[in-house]
Each structure stands twice: as C-alpha cells, then as structure tokens.
C-alpha cells in the first residue's frame, strides 16, 4: 500500500518529484490584506471557543432516532458537524447564511465574465468571510503556481488504459499525491494536536490546485489521444479559466464556457456534509488520514450511480426522448414520454432530492445562466430540458411516489456541457469531482483545527432493533 508508510516513501524515492511544467505570466499581486491562511488563523480561536460552549451542553438532545432513520441510510439524522453550508428543505443551500444569489452578487468575479469564482467560494466556506477581489487574485495565483502534478503521477495517468473509467483514474491519482503530504510527514515526525490544521491546510490547497490538472489530463488521455495538454497554466488567470484552457477551451472565443465552468464549480462545491462524497471524505479524514487519501475516498463515493452519475443519466435520457418524440413536439408528447418512463418502472432522472422539497436553487442558477445566452436558449436539447422542467413536476405529483417532484441541479448541468461540445458523458462526474473538493477540503481543515474525533457510530442488527421497539 502506497500510503503514509516509510517503506512506501523509499519505494517511490527513485521517482522525480515534480514535472517542470511551463507557466506563463509574471506579474504578482501585492496586497496589504491578509491571505487565506492568515485569515483562517485569525478565525480559529473564536471557533474553538464556540466549540467549548457547545460541549457544555453535551448531555442535551438535538433530535431523536427512529427505525426509519437507521434503516434508511441515516437520512435526516443530525449526526455530524459541517461548518460551510446548511441545506434547508424549502430554502435550499446557504453558505454561511448566504443564498446562491447572494454569493453571485457578493463574491469576486474573474477578469472576464460575470460569474463568481469558485476559489472565492472556497474562501467563504473556509473562513465565513467574503474576500476582496485583490485577495482572490493572490489566491488564484497561488493555486496556479501549485497546479503542476508530480511526474510519477503524470506517468501513472499516461499508463492507464484509455478506457479505464475517469473516476477510477481520478481517485487513484489523488490518492498517489499522498506521497507529498505535508500532514503525513509532520505527523510521522510528531506534531502538537493543536497544530494539525496547518499542514492539513497546506495539503488541501495543494490538492485543490492540482484537481483541474489531473482532470484535464484524464480528459486528454481518454478522449483526445493523449499528449500534451492544449494549454499551460497561466499564473494571471483564475482556477476555472485554467481548467477550461487545459480542456481546450481557453481564449476569448470561449469566455461563455469559462464563465459556465466558474458557476458550475462554485455551485457544486458544497451541499452540507451528509452526502456520500462529503461524508466519505470526513469519515476517512477522521482517522487522521491525510487530505489526499481522504478526498480520494470522497471521489470513489462520487463515482457511485446514486450520487455523482446523475448528470450523465439525465443527458442520456433527454437525448433518448429527443429521438423518440416528434421534432415539432407538443406538451402532450413530452407528457406521454414522461408517463411511459414511469410506467416502465424507471425513474425520471434529474428530479427529486434527498433533502430539498422545492426546486433546486442550483438548477435555477444554471437555467438562468443559459436563458440569458441566446446560443444556449436556442439549443433544442436545452429547450427540451426547459420544457421537461415545466411539465414533469405535475406528472410526478400525479404519479405520487416522490416527495420532491422538482428538478435538481443534474437536470441542467449535463446538457450545458453537451452544448459546449463535451459529449463524453462518463467524464461529467470528473468535472463534479474537481468542484466537490471545495467543501469537504474546507471542512477537513476545520476538523483538524477543532480536534474533532474519529467517527465511530454504534451499529445494531435487525433482531436488536425489533427487540428494542416491540411493545412501544
């Protein structure tokens, strides 16, 4: 196992540590404002005091456990701490109290485009504060400077079978980055528990910086014949622009796609802590596994059909519908196709949510983005998604087997990638994996800063449940 072990380090010692990737741009951003680590350092004491106040109420109850919670995947249980976001069934997601629309208005934008930067969302998730544009320019540059991946990881990706699932490649590459983990090395040497957060922070920033590079290399190898990426990392550009450029969508002519990517990455970054990718990252991290191993676990959870594959399933279903109904379809044609899907025992993909009971604000944000751009609004596939969102809720209500008949974010994300020429649906989850690093990695830093313990819930067998509840 190539984990934290000294023997593993020796085994990999002969490999060159870093590729010497070329970077363009020379101008830095001088600022008297604190950088991200300094801002976080200032926030930690107050949060530790808050934890002490909460612990003073340790014997009080914040909920009850029903049999349906235990049998139903722990759904609805308040069982873990998650600082960055809170999901309300009726209001949707809030990031430190801010709605998506608030974030779109308040968070810094890129040098081009109008959408919030996902690295600004990370700053908000981690610190609870809205950064200045100058602070984010400095942070974007730091991410660009750390974007290169070790040479042995690049070679590993190059040697994978081209048809190996992108998420398998992604998880393995992220796990292998643990070879350079500052936290793992500091822990081996002995580290005060109060200081765990700092090398964890360093690892999280390093990983966040490298996620687009890994994902772009997977795309290049799997779908574009391998070889060098289409663009080098530009130190003057933001995280999303560089990801877009490495996917072959750099330059002024691709500004709309770059802005879509900013919005997509920011929207998908965090959605409370109970979803599989976030919880898996937290769970593995609670054992003091470093951020690379922890987020690799999150990526493997994200690869599951019930979690991160929904966007590709929606697109496939929409394209099948488009082929099955007339070119000049009516609302009745769409209605009939929806019923045929349900009557065949299948679900309508892209509708419903484990928590939400209203339309997903992330779906609305992406649809608003698309509707404001004529080239997308006129796309027949997008128009069909739009028509479905108007008709499907009533059909699902009549069907009566869903608590939330409204569209979720997956209804719109895949079709937008498809519009911009990304037709490789298996890859959509890898893009999700770049985004989802924002929330779980921010929380992982707080897990270490607050000294949260290893996760160890109590399990019970079915006989035990029955004995406990019979006669109640």
Swiss-Prot record:
Leader sequence residues: none
The organelle targeting sequence, given as a residue range: 1-29
Pathway this chain belongs to: Organic acid metabolism; propanoate degradation
Binding site for CoA: 75, 193, 306, 348, 350-351, 402-403, 408
Reactions performed catalytically: propanoyl-CoA + oxaloacetate + H2O = (2S,3S)-2-methylcitrate + CoA + H(+); oxaloacetate + acetyl-CoA + H2O = citrate + CoA + H(+)
SUPFAM superfamilies the record matches: Citrate synthase
Places the protein is found: Mitochondrion matrix
A GO MF term: 2-methylcitrate synthase activity
Major location (coarse): mitochondrion
E.C. number(s) listed in UniProt: 2.3.3.5, 2.3.3.16
InterPro entries per UniProt: Citrate_synth-like_lrg_a-sub, Citrate_synth-like_sm_a-sub, Citrate_synthase, Citrate_synthase_AS, Citrate_synthase_sf
Active site (UniProt): 307, 353, 410
GO BP, one annotated term: carbohydrate metabolic process
GO CC annotation: mitochondrial matrix
Keywords of the record: Acyltransferase, Mitochondrion, Transferase, Transit peptide
PROSITE patterns per the UniProt record, alphabetical: CITRATE_SYNTHASE (PS00480)
Thermal effects: Optimum temperature is 49-54 degrees Celsius.
Description of pH dependence: Optimum pH is 8.0-9.0.
Principal EC category: transferase
Protein family according to the UniProt entry: Belongs to the citrate synthase family.
Function field: Component of the methylcitrate cycle that catalyzes the synthesis of (2S,3S)-2-methylcitrate from propionyl-CoA and oxaloacetate. Plays an important role in detoxification of propionyl-CoA, an inhibitor of both primary and secondary metabolism. Also has citrate synthase activity using as substrates acetyl-CoA and oxaloacetate.
Subunit structure, interactors included: Homodimer.
Protein name, entry field: 2-methylcitrate synthase, mitochondrial
Provenance organism: Fusarium solani
Recorded name of the encoding gene: mcsA
